[in-house]
């Protein structure tokens, strides 16, 4: 197993990994451009120039169309598409979800994918949509489980086999399904039937679905967020531990005149300017692009450039330990993404176990930053600071502080820690001049906790007049509370 | 005057304008790439391909160097640089600020700029740095004023004359200087000596300097934030009413191996990936770029692509009425920019007069969004809602609400308004599911104000359990307060 997916770098739940397939190694996180075997807006072999390392296509479409099927069986999938790198194939589950039935069995489509040389084979699972009755979700999950067990027995080649996690919008079902599949040792775990959540901007629920599935899986397994192709939510999904995405969006959106950016979608018809630096947008004006004969192709190219630039930014952010800063910025693009961000941090206790102990300087980006894993971790380890005697707590040096036994620094959103640690991660954090309410909530709570842990010490708290928070009163009960202005006069 | 600068679109303090110069019309906001007359990383004539519409160069350097001076005087500035579009010239003020003196008088350098055919002429003002004594700032400002008055008398051609606003970090001096210059009718107003503020990330003070200067100037005059070339802070500066920037950064940063993005700067040496979609970054890997023979030039090109893409995004955001959403997102790039954002909204009452009455859907991006001009405006006009009889306030429909005389909607960060206006701007706002503390502060205050304005009405407030805020108690004193859960059971 470990030979197939290797994790090289980590930040929050995100990671940079190497996925080994029969046709080569793929660096994750990445997006697989969806190739329609019938119509190609941009040829598969050109995909590498945008940054694609792996493609995905639909084996059911190939299976159903005589001329495609014959070529695929005779010359192989890679020759059919004209791409010699890794190719994943879908099974017809999507068609099943749209039309209610497909004209192929699980074994038939598995065998077909194996024969044509797919690098990642997907069984014919049941994609249960969001919001169905629990009973239906459970029943369909049982069918999916049977088919996946059969698939695991059926596929024994070097080709990778995907084990899709279903369970609708029931986190408990997703987690249960995931832990069951974990024991069957699939090589890749797609999270299925999440497209309707993304289409209706239900990012908070999407976060719960991903987190629940991840909790059931081994953290060392690669996870594919099936159907996710909009770069706007890649950072959020990567932070939760998704490694693979697939984009039909680049082409479908281009067909509709939709222009993808990492902050959302524009309609080309409504653009006065092309707000992007890609080769297409640097060369054409919005007006020229609208009138171009190959408008759809150019738009598809722009969409791919924008998509892969976001992947590179995400990978760089993981390297720099800045993934959550990126997530917090991206999630400002839409209030529903902000809901997703807030939901992400309800899982901070779980995320914390993956988050590196030391990383790039913490940047405070907003109230949600107060709930990041490293802030939580700080609050859980306050007992390591043992304080005795007289202790002064202040945001920055004050007169006469050397008369105290201990000098402590207060810094939101963390709390109170020994002044000598100011330059140490995470206390070297870059924070705004005056903390938000939420940052004060965390840091004042942690300060109260520290005081409670050290009942023998005598605390003096130098308060800033900008600290407007009900917990200040609480601090006043446990410490001598002096406002900075009054202190100066003492 | 109005013929020289025409404002076409507005959003917050930002605008899209047309600046007419002897060598053509420039659409603002825009950046003027700085051309060093001695060394050119990228040739002036190529600048158009990146999106540049106007260049800036230093007339003092040309004046001081025999061979440049001769060509400029004989063939003109435009022939010297090989660019037939608008060119602004600096006067030597920068050299004055660095070396303490220059070997030219105000009249000499003005006359020289006029003769060589500069499109925007800059007098030899005194760039007073931040943090000097008030006395010095005042004295230098007096000298600057004299020189600008002389310049205004001296330059009477069709060439545009710039009147730089100085005053160090004293907002009152900046505003005073600006109102004085307003009466002298310059065509362009640079805000001078702000580079040290930007270099040390003092964005909050920069905001105050810009706002103070703008308050003194006519809102119809074009403003140039002299020395600002990093795209990270363009959106913030544009929202305050800056129209022109100049970038030496694209070349200076390239020389140092620094890679510009709209979210900050990377060192090429430390990049594993190129997190951008521009023609350079789509073609090269980080490793290849580091090893390229023309690394500096390629990096300069990337820096220009990134810079002008941000300008296009800003212009599109103004068109869409989404400039403040962009500002709020960009200001997450660094906590000091977040300080700048918070400071921006301390000027909301002033910004509100420029902000269109109706624009694109309001997106809530964080606590600062609660202080946007449109939220402030709503709070100032509560008297237009006259409420009588029984009134129910709720976030979404509840049972039995039709028994009330008036049905009102509560939506943070705004407050309470008639339910029939839910789909009207700004109440059609996209907001997170649960409001932040700051959003509750604004909306609950406005609700209390509405109740006070309508003492005859009987209010019932259906409260959500997620609303944790001290003002809820206040609401309880003025209205019947019922939690949604309890209401269901009634």
Swiss-Prot record, chains A, B:
Q: How is this protein annotated for GO cellular component? A: cytoplasm
Tell me which residues bind Zn(2+). Answer: 276, 278, 281
Q: Which InterPro entries match?
A: ArchSynthase1/Queuine_TRR, TGT-like_sf, TgtA, tRNA_ribo_trans-like
Cofactor remark from the record: Binds 1 zinc ion per subunit.
Q: Which cofactors are required for activity?
A: Zn(2+)
Active site per database record: 90 (nucleophile)
Q: Which keywords, in A-to-Z order, does the entry hold?
A: Glycosyltransferase, Metal-binding, Transferase, tRNA processing, Zinc
Family matches, as SUPFAM superfamilies: Pre-PUA domain, tRNA-guanine transglycosylase
Per the UniProt entry, the Enzyme Commission number(s) are: 2.4.2.48
Q: Which family does it belong to?
A: Belongs to the archaeosine tRNA-ribosyltransferase family.
Q: What is the name of this protein?
A: tRNA-guanine(15) transglycosylase
State the organism named in the record: Methanosarcina mazei (strain ATCC BAA-159 / DSM 3647 / Goe1 / Go1 / JCM 11833 / OCM 88) (Methanosarcina frisia)
Underlying gene: tgtA
